[in-house]
Amino acid sequence: MLNDIKNNAQTRMAKSIDALKHTLTSIRTGRATPALLDRVTVNAYGNASTPLNQVASISNADAHSLLVTPFDKGMIKEIEKGLYNAEFTPNTLGTAIRINMPPPTEERRKELVKQVQKEGEGAKIAIRNIRQDANKEIAKLVKDKAISEDEKKRGEDDIQKLTDTNIKDVDKVVADKEKELLSV
């Protein structure tokens, strides 16, 4: 019973960290990575919300630009529209599209660091809420007389250790992203 609660809490905490990492990949650092275009959608064959990576290959042209090569050359105009809508500036090179990523200004980098910290704080809050849910489940087991007070204390301590470990992981992810932002 306690192990199920701990495993469930660990799984949910890991999902919170994964969600944070996914969110942080979409923050532009000035370095070009294909993950920046994960949320770009295009109007392909009548479907207005087709992900870009399903209609084109995305690769790094160099450290500050991406190359989008459509699988169907007739899709170039739609891909350009999708990129413009996502606030990118595409340059068409015949059968491919280049996207330049200018390095952000110092002021913009500081704004991005604040955004990263805010996202990190959101992940920490989610982890603390998961801890609270797990502790409530443990308290319910005591109330139902399924476990003793000693087991409750041990379970709560284990949940707290999980929480501390996962919050350290969030801090590391946030610190790494801040370092990446400020080193451009």
Swiss-Prot record:
Calcium found in the keyword field: no
Cell location: Cytoplasm
CDD domains: RRF
Keyword Oxidoreductase: no
Keywords for this protein: Cytoplasm, Protein biosynthesis
GO cellular component: cytosol
Gene Ontology molecular function terms on file: ribosomal large subunit binding
Gene Ontology process terms (BP): cytoplasmic translational termination
Pfam families, sorted: RRF
Family named by the database record: Belongs to the RRF family.
Stored NCBIfam families: frr
Entry function: Responsible for the release of ribosomes from messenger RNA at the termination of protein biosynthesis. May increase the efficiency of translation by recycling ribosomes from one round of translation to another.
Protein name: Ribosome-recycling factor
Organism of origin: Stenotrophomonas maltophilia (strain K279a)
Organism classification: Bacteria, Pseudomonadati, Pseudomonadota, Gammaproteobacteria, Lysobacterales
Gene giving rise to this polypeptide: frr
